[in-house]
Amino acid sequence: YLYMSLLYDDCFEKGKGMFAGGIRYLSGTLETYGNTNTADSLTAIKELVYEKKIISKDELLKALDANFIGNEKIRQQLIKTPKYGNDNDSADKMLIDVHEHVCNYVRDQAERVGLQSFLVVVINNSANTLMGHQTSASADGRKSGEPMANGNNPSGGSDVNGPTAFLNSLVKPSPYI
């Protein structure tokens, strides 16, 4: 970071590196992956396990551990629950709750690690595929090894109400958190 420190007037004037007190406003970002899958999974669990009581917690865990092998009926039930990206208030609210929880937690860590701000970046790149390959099955119906949703987009194939519904879902989370 010495080279980067040379690019900041504060560091140059104080003769200190960025992380040695040279910069006036030090901030950071944290890239997150799987937010949509997490929200869709929590929506499915809430609906099927707790509200409708169609699947027990033990049945769900068994199906997830088996990567849905021998549990296709459960997988299809999970897939059919409301998903983010369709302008569905319950699914979109779950994503908002996940997003706010992650953002608030990360923001609260700023002081602990000596930053003036610490923000979440919901990233869009090919890492969703890599992360999916390294992640076991999820309660949204995604099998182990399948790609996760890319950034703040719906999971592949789950946005079935068209582009306007997707855009309506996309703008619901606050960009100011």
Range-by-range predicted roles:
Residues Y1-I177:
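Acidic, glycine-enriched catalytic cores built around paired aspartates
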